[in-house]
């Protein structure tokens, strides 16, 4: 008959407890590592999603100081974006830099202080939109400079097809002194599509060396309401009959 001493039995019990504790610790550590890894992956995923939305700016709702959202196309949800730079199609953008105060903001609805805003609806106190320079199709633009097809534009300079009164303040002896041009009225070897400038094809409310279709001038293919040496097709205002 085999006999065991109390010491041997006790030692075996302690050893078994140590093994059990070690296994439990290993399982706990493995679970903790797994959770940390999942958390890290989740953070990476959120970071990538954030970066994707920042680049696309599609859901940038009420984005403040979006200065580097440069030429963002279809920023449909940049609603009331503050200080958005080159936000396109911004709806009710207030005080946005180059959107409301927007430079080349296209189709800005109620854009305030927009520079070169094309198709701006009810732009108030806009710089070069209401006080807008070459704003195309601005609705209710006040004091628009070279606004094309502006509805109710007050004190518009060289506004084409503007409804409800314009005060033309022609100056210098360049294209600004040429009033009411007809089709194919040429100056400075270029023709224009619609209110543009600075030597470029333009698609929508832009200027200075780019392809643009709307609201620009100076050496580009344009259709209506332009100046500085171009073929003009519709109701241009730079040549006296």
UniProtKB/Swiss-Prot annotation:
Compositional bias ranges of the Low complexity kind: 84-145
Superkingdom per UniProt: Eukaryota
Keywords for this protein: Malaria, Repeat, Signal
InterPro entries found in the cross-reference section: Plasmodium_HRP
Stretches with biased composition (Basic and acidic residues): 52-76, 195-231
Signal peptide: 1-21
Any Pfam family matching the protein: Plasmodium_HRP
Region (Disordered) location: 52-145, 195-241
Name by which UniProt lists this protein: Histidine-rich protein PFHRP-III
Biological source species: Plasmodium falciparum
